[in-house]
């Protein structure tokens, strides 16, 4: 007869892999068509000009250009836009936007 009680097995020791969410391209960065700008759960960021939203709320660029972050509306929702390079030069000349490099 055994004099030691059998040790129980642990039920710990597992964890899920991280989902790598967050901003992938920041304001002022150059992006090409199809580049992922943000991976998110829900709409923390909303699509602006030249940006589309995937079925998992991923925001991606539909043209090549420069990324621009904006807050709009009463609730100050965050929008991400991509500005075409030739439009960017005109807007910079008219001082409508500022870009940090």
Swiss-Prot record:
One MF annotation (Gene Ontology) recorded for this entry: structural constituent of ribosome
Instruction: Note the HAMAP family from the entry.
Output: Ribosomal_bL27 (MF_00539)
Source organism, top-level taxon: Bacteria
Listed SUPFAM superfamilies:
Ribosomal L27 protein-like
Question: Does the record bear Metal-binding in its keywords?
Answer: no
Does the keyword field hold Ribonucleoprotein? yes
What InterPro entries does UniProt report for this protein, alphabetically?
Ribosomal_bL27, Ribosomal_bL27_CS
Q: Where is this region: Disordered?
A: 1-21
Identify the taxonomic lineage of the organism of origin.
Bacteria, Pseudomonadati, Pseudomonadota, Gammaproteobacteria, Enterobacterales
Q: What name appears for this protein in its UniProt entry? A: Large ribosomal subunit protein bL27
| GO annotation, cellular component aspect | cytosolic large ribosomal subunit
BP terms from Gene Ontology: translation
